[in-house]
A protein has these predicted regions:
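A short, N-terminal "cap"/entry segment at the start of jelly-roll beta-barrel domains
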Residues: 1-41
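Conserved short histidine dyad/triad with adjacent acidic residue
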Residues: 36-55, 89-92
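Short, conserved beta-strand element in jelly-roll/cupin
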Residues: 45, 54-70
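Short beta-strand His + acidic residue motifs that chelate non-heme Fe in jelly-roll/DSBH
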Residues: 52-53, 70-71, 88-89, 93-101
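Short acidic-glycine-tyrosine-enriched beta hairpin
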Residues: 74-91
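A short hydrophobic beta-strand segment most commonly corresponding to one strand
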Residues: 85-88, 101-110
């Protein structure tokens, strides 16, 4: 990830338009900003969300609210609570997200 030609700025995430992305179950609401090749998102997963695909994109992710369970293709599962994060490189380890009955809110950079 190269951060170049990004002037100092601030984001009021409540002003960023949200888009809905359906999961296998539930949905995700994304508020997205693009800074050159860097995508920055505030994502709210609905209760009982399950991603509809195995993701191979790299991310740095921080849980802000709720619980996020990340399942890796090799069978490992990790549950993150608010204040916890993970990082994974592009094409390193396929993974998918799910939430429990409370949903989750995340900050993601990729």
């Amino acid at each position: 990830m190269q951060m170049q030609d990004i002037p100092f700025g601030t984001t009021d995430w409540s002003d960023v338009e949200q888009t809905e992305h359906k999961g296998e179950t539930g949905h995700a609401l994304w508020r997205t900003r693009q800074f050159g090749g860097i995508r920055v998102r505030m994502v709210e997963y609905s209760p009982n969300y399950l991603a509809d695909h195995w993701c191979e994109k790299g991310h740095i992710l921080l849980v802000l609210d709720g619980l996020l369970e990340t399942e890796l293709a090799d069978g490992r599962r990790v549950v993150l609570k608010p204040g916890q994060s993970y990082q994974v490189a592009d094409k390193a380890e396929p993974h998918r997200s799910r939430t429990g009955p409370e949903g989750a809110k995340l900050f993601i950079v990729d």
